[in-house]
Each structure stands twice: as structure tokens, then as C-alpha cells.
Regions:
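N-terminal non-catalytic accessory region
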Residues: 1-57, 61-103
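Helical cap/lid subdomain of alpha/beta-hydrolase-fold lipid enzymes
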Residues: 72-187
Length: 187
């Protein structure tokens, strides 16, 4: 791993007295597989700290995985809150449109994403294999199956990149997605 995906955020929380843990799932595994990783990590953190509950902050697909762990894997009793950041809870119209793009181009773009995920620490990134969950129909089905636990506090935030050049890694995504879906965080 060449750098921390979360940037300076963990240190900011730790400076305020919070203990920070990472689930360690791969970005491109299925929601179900990564939810199992999240569920195991919740158990480990509870055992390690003696805490009754954890607060989860999840980004992008990680929000779907945390919701699945809470709802389908019974971890709601150990979660006080789930905060999702730029999670595609309703899917992406951009991903829906990929069916009109030649497959070799989609695969090429996915391979470029895989390189970025590998640099961030993923062992075997497979963006092409994991993008189906971002289709709006797949997200709607997931939302039908994954019911919020009434004992968990949920909140969700989305962000807007001011200008595409704010993050050169996200620049191409930002421009493309903005044409289809409007302002976005680059993903």
C-alpha cells in the first residue's frame, strides 16, 4: 500500500480521541463478500476494545457493504451509526449507459481503475467484475433486500468536485459523469 485511501481523515479522528479501525475489504469484491469482511471486522473490534457498538464511516461501495452487514448478516446490534460518503445507494445512470459502449473500451477503462485500486492496496482488483452493482436496477433490488435496522442511526453525504482539475485521478470520471448525472465527486 503506497498511501492511505482515507488521507488525513483517520489522524483527524484520532486527534479528537477516537479509535480508528479499517475493515480491509477489497474495493472490487462483491457486496456480499465484502459485507462478510466488514461483519468479521466488527466482531474483531468489539472483542478487541470491549465496546458495545461501533460507528461506521464508509465510502462509495463500502456503504452498500456496511448496510448489507448490518441488515443481512445481523451486525445491527453492534453498530450505533452508519455514515456513508458518496455511496451510490440508487446506482448510477452512467453505469447503466455502459451497455452501449463497446466492451473492449469498458474493459480498458476498468483496467485503468484496477491500477489505481492496486496502488491503494487491493490485492486483486476487478473493476469490470464488480460494476454490475452500480446499475440502477441492481441498486433498487439491493435496496428492497437490505432493510435499515431501526436501532442504527443512518446518515449519508454526497460531495461535489468544484472543478475537474481538483483531483487529476478523478478528472476523467468527473467530466464524464457530470455530462450524464450532473455535479459529482468524480466517481
Amino acid at each position: 500500500k503506497l498511501f492511505c485511501y482515507w488521507g488525513r481523515t483517520p489522524k483527524a479522528f484520532e486527534a479528537r480521541g477516537c479509535r480508528v479501525f479499517f475493515a480491509g475489504q477489497n474495493s472490487s469484491d462483491t457486496v456480499e463478500a465484502n459485507a462478510a469482511v466488514v461483519a468479521r471486522r466488527i466482531d474483531e473490534i468489539i472483542a478487541l476494545t470491549g465496546a458495545e457498538k461501533v460507528n461506521i464511516i464508509a465510502h462509495s461501495k463500502g456503504g452498500l457493504e456496511a448496510r448489507y452487514a448490518i441488515s443481512k448478516l445481523g451486525k445491527g446490534k453492534f453498530v450505533a451509526s452508519l455514515t456513508t460518503l458518496s455511496t451510490p445507494h440508487h446506482g448510477s445512470k452512467t453505469v447503466d449507459l455502459l451497455r452501449f459502449v463497446p466492451d473492449f473500451l469498458v474493459r480498458l477503462c476498468c483496467k485503468c481503475c484496477d491500477i489505481g485500486f492496486w496502488v491503494m492496496g487491493d490485492k486483486k482488483p476487478d473493476t469490470y467484475g464488480s460494476i454490475s452493482i452500480f446499475r440502477t436496477a441492481a441498486a433498487a433490488e439491493l435496496n428492497r433486500q437490505v432493510i435499515d435496522d431501526p436501532a442504527v442511526y443512518y446518515q449519508s453525504y454526497a460531495f461535489i468536485m468544484k472543478r475537474p482539475t481538483s483531483d487529476m485521478l478523478m478528472c476523467p470520471h468527473n467530466i464524464f459523469v457530470k455530462l450524464i448525472e450532473g455535479d459529482n465527486d468524480g466517481l
